[in-house]
């Protein structure tokens, strides 16, 4: 999955950055207030592979969508966010694949 440099969530521009490391050794984080979504290149001593970065990107987008909707409780439920994001990744990849075949 190619990760874009910028996305929009609820009319708000969000800049997407790949950084070497994030605070507290997180894989990713989104801050709607600052309009930033960051993805870690390195997690502890391991490089995050491309598919993991793609999954992290969608995971953070799900947080951003839920926060924009005012669904703070759902957004703080990592089990829900992980499951929902992993299901979305599969659908998104199939859509991209179908569009490339045209």
Question: Where do the PLM segments sit?
Answer:
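Short, Lys/Arg-rich amphipathic alpha-helical interaction segments
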Residues: 94-102
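Active-site recognition of the HExxH zinc-binding catalytic motif
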Residues: 55-67
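Active-site scaffold of zinc-dependent metalloenzymes
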Residues: 2-51, 67-68, 72-82, 86, ...
């Amino acid at each position: 999955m190619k990760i874009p440099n910028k996305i929009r969530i609820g009319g708000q521009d969000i800049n997407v950055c790949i950084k070497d490391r994030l605070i507290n050794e997180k894989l990713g984080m989104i801050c709607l207030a600052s309009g930033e979504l960051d993805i870690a290149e390195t997690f502890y001593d391991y490089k995050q592979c491309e598919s993991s970065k793609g999954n992290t990107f969608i995971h953070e987008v799900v947080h951003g969508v839920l926060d924009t909707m005012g669904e703070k409780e759902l957004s703080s439920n990592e089990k829900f966010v992980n499951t929902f994001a992993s299901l979305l990744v599969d659908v998104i990849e199939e859509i991209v694949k179908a569009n490339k075949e045209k």
